[in-house]
Each structure stands twice: as structure tokens, then as C-alpha cells.
Amino acid sequence: MDITILGSGTAVPSLDRNSSGVLIQEQNTHSLVDFGYGTLKALLHLGISYHDIDRIFFTHNHPDHMCDLVPFLFGARYHLSPRKKDLEIVAGPGFGEYFENLMSAFKNWLVPSEYQIRITEIDEGTKDFGCFSVISKKVRHIQISRGYRFENLDGKSVALSGDTDYCDGMIELGREADLMILECAMPDEEKIAGHLVPSLVGKLAKEAKCKTLCLTHFYPPCNMEIIRKTVSAIYKGDLFLAQDLMRFQL
């Protein structure tokens, strides 16, 4: 399983960090977890186009986690090279209605010309997707928010939080995972509801006992040295601070 950070940033535009997005490649399939702005271009840097994506998982529907879906769908209609492979979009309950409203807002300009879109709503539980299974659990951000754990046929696992505060659901998803990708939105002194700070990241990762931890979703007040020092004082596993296009192999 190959995992690439497409965007390690936030809702605040940055020259250095795209908004949230992760690419998971397994057995010649390409799955996205979130699709924030800038991530579509990051895919092109990897040689991956709108033809290649098989499935998109959304942790929730805030713009910094999904707005590159619009140019993706619009580009896939390009008449000289239209997408032909069906696309599955996976998200929490209520996403189907949200997606219909999004499509309506753009009239017919996002409607596929030569492929079908299937919306799969999953609440909490496990679903088999062939080359991997996905466990979904509620996390603490907004009502639709879900965290995911991907497990391939070799037993390798990656857990992803999207946006979340400290919660049991994310601890369970990250339990002894080979890799856990957690948001670390703000420094401790700037804590806001629905987001993690370094001390809580360290506590969550320690309780989950994940093997490797990658932090992402850094708002401008974040100081990387302080984040690393604070988290490392609590969590003793391997720690990475995400950069766009950082890759992991499991």
C-alpha cells in the first residue's frame, strides 16, 4: 500500500501547502481521501489524471476537504478525452443530498458524459472494497464527519482522521495501525473546538499505540519544532510532520 500526502494545509491558502488530501494506491487502484484545493494539481505531479481515480472518500464536506471535486468533474467531461471509468464516492450519511445540491448548483456542467457516479453512504462499520476493507467511525468535528481505517489483504493498515477533536472513535481507528494520519490544526494555546492540538495528538496516538504517526492540516500559527517536541514527549513511536507529496509505503 502506497500513501501520498497531496495536501497538508488548511482552509487558509498557502504557497507551500495544498488543502487536505491523501492518495492511497493498492493493487493498481487509486483512491483519494479528501480532495481539497490544490490536490488535483498534486495528482498531476504524480502522473495521475481524472481518468485514473477509482474512488473518493470524504471525511466531511467542508470546502478545504473537497472543493477540487468540482474541477475534477468538470475536466472529466472534456470532449476530446472524456473520462469513461465509473466513479464511486464514499462519505457519511447525508452526503448524497449534499452532492445533489452541488451538482444542481452547476446545472449540467458537472454531470458525467460517458461514465456513472455512485454515491455510497457509510455510517459506522466495515465495508469491503476488494483489495482493501475500510472501517468507518464517527469523529468529533461536524455531524457528517467520519474517520477511516484502510486495511489491505496483507494486513497493513492506515488510519486517517480528517478533521477531529480528541475522541474514542479515532483511538479505535488508529489502534496499532501501521500508519495514522492525524490533523494537528493549532498550537495548544490556540485550541478550538473540533480540532486537535499537539498535546492531544500525543495523547491520542499514545493510547492508540499506532506504529507510525504523520501529522497534517497545520494552520499558520503552528510551529513545527514545538509540535514535534510536544508530541514526542508523549508519543514514542515514529513521528512525521507532513509535507505535500510526502510518501509512505506499507
Predicted feature descriptions by range:
Residues 48-51, 85, 113-115, 130-132, ...:
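Structured loop/turn residues at beta-strand edges in well-structured enzyme cores
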Residues 1-46, 146-162, 179:
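Conserved beta-strand hairpin/beta-sheet module of binuclear metal-dependent hydrolase folds
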Residues 43, 69-72, 99-102, 170, ...:
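Hydrophobic packing residues within well-ordered alpha-helices of enzyme cores
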